[in-house]
Design a protein with these regions (language model features):
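Beta1/beta-strand and adjacent pyrophosphate-binding region of the FAD-binding site
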Residues: 4-20
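Residue-level detector of alpha-helix initiation sites
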Residues: 18-19, 295, 521
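Glycine-rich loop(s) and the adjacent beta-strand/alpha-helix scaffold that form part
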Residues: 27-30, 34-55, 244, 253, ...
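Conserved N-terminal glycine-rich FAD pyrophosphate-binding loop of Rossmann-like flavoproteins
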Residues: 42-66, 95-108
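Conserved redox-cofactor binding core of oxidoreductases
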Residues: 61-71, 76, 81, 85-88, ...
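A glycine-rich dinucleotide-binding beta-alpha-beta segment and adjacent secondary-structure elements
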Residues: 77, 198-205, 213-220, 256-260, ...
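FAD cofactor-binding and catalytic pocket of flavoenzymes
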Residues: 78-101, 105, 110-111, 116, ...
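A conserved FAD-binding loop/helix module that cradles the flavin
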Residues: 524-542
Length: 556
């Protein structure tokens, strides 16, 4: 792998190696630019995926050196429901390894639907929210969705329905098997007149681009994939970036600041180098791409204060860190007479799409969501979560645990969350992280509309499980998110610098050679997992950035 000296001014520094950072690294390095990817995590099993460990203890309680996710002891954070509360220590985590969250995520990879880019125009706004149209349309992004799906490797159904975004090209791989959960949900759908399809996933169902197809081992969500079937940045993108000879991945590099000169241009990044006793190092760069995720990205911008940017970098609008969206839950669990064997295969096999569209009049709330059925939990997860309707310990607990462990199915739903300005990521004035910097503080309470949506999906989950033949059903309580893996909206894109942080090509309004490329740029949250849209937007940004750099619009 190419190695650059910190004193050597590279064309691009990319902060983060996940869904967006991996795309940016591959595209920019392939175009001939010099690239350094700053990753605060370790290598993981990069290049040696067969060494990923399936041990539940290691994956649930990872050792510092082997971790795949961030550790709240080091990447400390706090949480509160509103600005009047005192924040307490939080448990927010994210992917912290080469490949970021794509190494361990469940890999659902649906596109946004066309109307999700112009909801304000199509459906109107709502009091107390920041609902607005995106500065880009689905038609502009569609070619990049296709590019992402084919280069990364996506499995999914090739069917046409208004409930799925129109595609110029089918998915490259056939769908993953439906499993017992899929068969049961199809049974319910036939009774309830619902549309069910196989899930769209960044897990290849068959050999693709030199990688093995999924072997249905069951050590899926939360684990690294030993056969490279999960299309993470670590296997589908970064090896190609490194192979160009233009890209260095620099691990254990904790970026603390994006530096700027007197004219307001980014000049590089200052980071703590674990390999050098955590000494501060400055890496020079002509352009900085920030792809750290929807919570660490705004935190780093706020940490990068200077006399020119006293409110934080790229924050003349005052919106950095605001409009945080994470995705709410709310579902139900059902017990079935026969064993389900859901421990096999990918975590999600089937999806209910009927409630994706917006239908305020019929449902009483703004937004929608996609419903999935899952039974995959490891023995340790079952033991810690506990059986439903049973004592919390003793013989009754053990009996219920044995009875339910392989016969329980849970509806897990991804529901739209409206952008609210007071839902924020900022700097905690009291807590410091392991490097002595202000810790991340998350403040979030869902809009009252979202609580209505959560209750709607809880009720629908109960209906579906009963129709599927569940002998017992337990409804979840409303789960108002405390932050999570799908953070977005905290550096929103737009045409007006007064009401957005970056433009339609992810260039910061205030800093001409700073690009924010991850879920932070989302304007509205969407009804599906955000990763495929993050990837498509990154391909679009890279395309623009390469053309701009070669034409002199970005000085490289």
């Amino acid at each position: 792998m190419k190695k650059y000296k910190p004193s050597e001014e590279v064309d691009f520094v990319i902060i983060g190696s996940g869904a967006a950072g991996g795309v940016m690294a591959k595209q920019l390095a392939t175009a001939g630019f010099s690239v350094v990817v700053m990753e605060q995590g370790a290598w993981g099993a990069y290049g040696h995926e067969q060494d990923y460990n399936k041990d539940e203890l290691i994956n649930r309680f990872p050792a510092e050196e082997d971790k795949l996710i961030s550790d709240p002891k080091f990447q400390r954070n706090t949480f509160r429901r509103n600005a009047n509360e005192k924040a307490v220590a939080g448990g927010h985590t994210y992917g912290c390894v080469v490949g970021g969250g794509t190494v361990t995520y469940g890999a659902s990879s649906w596109r946004h639907l066309p109307y999700e880019f112009n909801e304000a125009s199509k459906f109107g706004t709502m009091k107390g929210t920041g609902i607005a149209d995106w500065p880009v349309s689905y038609e502009e992004i569609e070619p990049y969705y296709t590019q992402a799906e084919w280069e990364i490797g996506i499995s999914g159904p090739n069917i046409k329905t208004p409930l799925i975004a129109p595609m110029s090209k089918p998915y490259p791989c056939r769908p993953l098997p439906l499993k017992s959960s899929g068969a049961l949900i199809q049974k319910a759908a036939a009774k309830l007149n619902l549309t069910v399809t196989p899930n769209v996933a960044a897990i290849i169902a068959e050999p693709y681009n030199g990688r093995s197809g999924c072997i249905n081992c069951g050590a899926c969500s939360g684990y690294g994939c030993q056969v490279k079937a999960r299309s993470s940045s670590a296997v589908a993108l970064l090896p190609y970036a490194v192979a160009t000879g233009n890209c260095e991945i620099r691990v254990h590099s904790y970026v603390r600041e994006i530096a700027v000169d007197a004219s307001g241009r980014a000049t590089g990044v200052t980071y703590f180098d674990k390999a050098n006793n955590n000494q501060e190092v400055f890496q020079k760069a002509k352009c900085v791409v920030l792809s750290a995720n929807g919570t660490e990205t705004p935190r780093l911008l706020l940490l990068s204060k200077s006399s020119r940017f006293p409110q934080g970098l790229a924050n003349s609008s005052g919106l950095v860190g605001k409009y945080l969206m994470t995705g709410n839950g709310g579902g139900a669990s059902g017990l079935f007479a026969d064993p389900l064997n859901e421990y096999k295969g990918a975590v999600t096999g089937a999806a209910v799409l009927s409630y994706v569209p917006n239908d305020v009049k019929a449902r009483g709330f703004y937004g929608g969501g996609r419903m999935t059925a899952r039974g995959q939990m490891s023995p340790m997860q079952y033991g810690l979560a506990g059986p439903h309707g049973a004592p919390s310990w003793g013989a009754g607990y053990k009996k219920a645990l044995i009875e339910q462990a392989n016969r329980r199915l849970t509806m897990v739903n991804f529901i739209s969350q409206l952008p609210v300005e007071t839902n924020t990521v900022d700097l905690d004035p009291d807590m410091k992280d392991a490097w002595g910097l202000p810790a991340m503080r998350i403040t979030t309470t869902s809009h009252e509309n979202d609580f209505k949506g959560m209750q709607f999906f809880i009720d629908r989950s109960v209906e579906i499980l009963k129709a599927a033949g569940a002998t017992q059903v337990w409804a979840d309580g409303i789960n108002d998110s405390k932050g999570g893996a799908h953070a977005r909206g905290t550096a929103r894109m737009g045409n007006d610098p007064k009401s957005s942080v970056v433009n339609k090509y992810h260039r910061a309004h205030d800093v001409p050679n700073l690009f924010v490329v991850d879920g932070s740029s989302f304007v509205t949250g969407g009804r599906n997992h955000p990763t495929m849209t993050i990837s498509a937007l990154a391909y679009r940004c890279a395309d623009h950035l390469i053309k701009a750099a070669k034409s002199g619009n970005v000085t490289i």
